[in-house]
Amino acid sequence: GAAPDFRWDASGYKGTVIHTLYRPSAPEWEEANRMVREGLQYYSEQWYRYPYPNMTSIEGPVEGMEYPMITFCPRAPAREDRQWVIAHELGHQWVPMIVGSNERLYPWMDEGFNTFIDLANAARYFAGTPYGDSIEVHPLHLYADHALPGQEQPLILHPVESTDLFWTGYQKPALMMQTLRYEVLGQERFDRSFREYLRTWAYKHPTPADFFRLMRDVSGMDLDFFWRAWIYTTARLDQAVDSVATAGGAQKVFLSNRGGMTLPLEMDLTYDDGSTDRITLPVEMWNL
């Protein structure tokens, strides 16, 4: 054959033939075909059906690179790292291969959206393990080290101007999408909106304005406040209890949003009898 020194595994998913090729020196890749197949199934069923007849993932002395229907990945001996890079390069089949956003201008629409979907895929693949149960919050754990006051840059900057592309291109936009999904819109409304974005802009070239407009129209919420904070500025979340007053036997808690970022508010309450309660107030409480 053309590559006699490579091992070849094959499987399929709904008419798509899935190939993995790897060197004998990378026996860990025996699981790779399953990783590709389960990732392709997840992305297809959760977001947008994979439209091509083949998908090939090849192991080699590379960092990771994607092309239509073929990806190149490093050996990555650690199982979690291997699954992540395989699923990440696979995810690029959706962005920017199917939905052709301009990664040279807006990496957050490419690497960021892809990081968002592949973290969710990793959580599913490793479900029930400490890694699977925590991987989606990985970008949040990076926040303190990368969102440094006076140094952090807005996502909207061109990548050539970025001093921390790992944060502005990959991790912060993934955190942004997670926050929009789990905290602002809710999972059902977000998923319906993002699926429609992928469907509407498949084989086209959306700009940020196209994405904003579609998410607004499908979700039914004006999200300008959200995009302004996350993409056009480096706003921070700073919610506070301003004061507590007693009136008519009841206590009133006065809250304020002191930062430039507007999000729902979560508050723990302790009552006179010692019982506690955690309440979440929706983002609309700030009278957007």
Residue ranges and their predicted role:
Residues 25-30, 102-104, 160-167, 197-202:
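Active-site rim elements
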Residues 31-38, 42, 68, 81, ...:
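Extracytoplasmic/secreted proteins, especially bacterial periplasmic and envelope-associated proteins
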Residues 105, 111-179, 183-184:
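Acidic/His/Gly-enriched intrinsically disordered linker/tail segments
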Residues 1-87, 116:
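Hydrophobic helix-coil surface modules that form long, contiguous segments used
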Residues 166-253:
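Amphipathic alpha-helical substructures
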Residues 223-224, 237-288:
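Beta-strand-rich binding/interaction modules
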Residues 15-17, 49-55, 91, 172, ...:
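Loop/turn elements at helix/coil->beta-strand transitions in domains of secreted/extracellular proteins
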Residues 72-137, 194:
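Zinc-dependent metallopeptidase catalytic helix centered on the HExxH motif
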